[in-house]
Amino acid sequence: MSETLNLLKQLIERPSITPNDAGCQTILIDRLKSVGFQCEHLPFGEVHNFWAWHGHQSPFIIFAGHTDVVPPGDETQWHSPPFTPTEKNGYIYGRGAADMKSGLAAMVVAAENFVKQNPDHNGTIGFIVTSDEEGPAENGTQKVVDYLQQKNIKLDYCIVGEASSNEKLGDAIKIGRRGSMHGELTIIGKQGHIAYPHLADNPIHRSFQAFEALAKTKWDEGNEHFTPTSFQFYNVEAGAGAANVIPATLKAKFNFRFAPIHTTQQLQQKVERILNYYQLNYDIQWNVSSQPFFSGNGRLATFVRQAIQEICHLNTEPNTYGGTSDGRFIATTGCEVIELGPVNKTAHHVNENICIADLEKLTDIYFRTLQLLI
C-alpha cells in the first residue's frame, strides 16, 4: 500500500464532522515532526488548527487544507460506512475522500519525501491546517493568518489542496475565487384581514416587481478571468399563521457571487436603488462572507502547470469557477494562491470517492512543484 493511500485511510477513519478534528491533526503533526518540521497547535474556540514549517529562508511556500468534513447524510444510502475507508474497483470510498483528506494526505507525503531527499533545501515549506472550513470559517485559517501576520511571517506561495479538478486529475486549477455576499431583506407592510385588502398593505404583492427586477438585473459582463456576477434568492418567507390574514412582513434571503469588478458597497447600493424605485418600506442586513481574490498566472501557477503536464500529460485550465475556499484568507497576505487537488465530482455526495491511482499522481505533482519552486 502506498504511503499516501495509507495516510488517507487513517484520516477517513476519523469522523471529523465540522468543526470536530477527531484526531486527524495529531496524525499529520506526528508525521511532519518525524521529518523535522516544527509545529504549533493553534486552537481558537472549539476549532483545531496547526501551523508547521521546515526551513528558514525565502521563498516561503505553504500547503493549506482542512481536516473537517460535512455530515454524511443518510448513511443507508452509502454502499459502505462513510467513515470506513473502502476500496472498490480502483476507487476508495469514504467521507472526505475527495474533500479534502486526499489532498492533505498527498501534500504531507510529498513534503515528507522532499525534506528527506533535500534536508537542507532552499526556502521554507509550511502547512496551515484547520478543522473549520466546512463550517463558519471564523476560527480557522483566518485566525491562523492573523497570527502569522502578527509574527511578521511573509508568505510567498500557497497551494490549497481543495478538489479543483473536473473530469481528470489536473485538468483545472483555481487561480482565484469569486466573493460571496448575503442579504437578509424584510419588506414591511400592514397586517389585515384577507377579505379587506384595502385596509392592509400586502408585502407579498408589493415585492413582486422589485424581486423580478433584481432577478433580471445584469450586474456585469464578467471578464476574461471571472464569469458574470450571480444573484440568487434562496429563501422567501411570509404568512401570519392563518389563512385569512394578510401578513405584516415578507422576509427574503439572497446571495451574490461576484468578481473583483465590483466592491460590495457598489452592489449594495444598486440593490437599494431598485428597492427604492419600487417604493418599498424595507430593512436590509448585509453579510460579506468572503471577498474575491485573483492571483493570476504567476510563478507558482506556471510551475504547477508544468508539473501537471509532466505527470498527467495535460494542459491544465486555470479558472476561478466554483464556491469559496480558505484561499481567500491567505490571499490577503499578498502571496500567490492556487488551488490544486483531486476530481471534485463526488465532494459532499453520498459515496464520496477518489481514484486510487490519482493519489500517487497528486503526490508527485506536489513534490515536483516543490522541486521547481525551491
UniProtKB/Swiss-Prot annotation:
Q: Where does Zn(2+) 1 bind?
A: H66, D99, E162
Query: Cofactor stoichiometry and binding?
Result: Binds 2 Zn(2+) or Co(2+) ions per subunit.
Q: Which residues form the signal peptide?
A: none
Q: Which Gene3D superfamilies match?
A: 3.30.70.360, Zn peptidases (3.40.630.10)
* Keywords per UniProt: Amino-acid biosynthesis, Cobalt, Diaminopimelate biosynthesis, Hydrolase, Lysine biosynthesis, Metal-binding, Zinc
Q: What does the sequence similarity comment in the record state about its family?
A: Belongs to the peptidase M20A family. DapE subfamily.
Describe, as the record does, how this protein assembles with itself and its partners. Homodimer.
Q: What is this protein called?
A: Succinyl-diaminopimelate desuccinylase
Its organism's taxonomic lineage begins at: Bacteria, Pseudomonadati, Pseudomonadota, Gammaproteobacteria, Legionellales
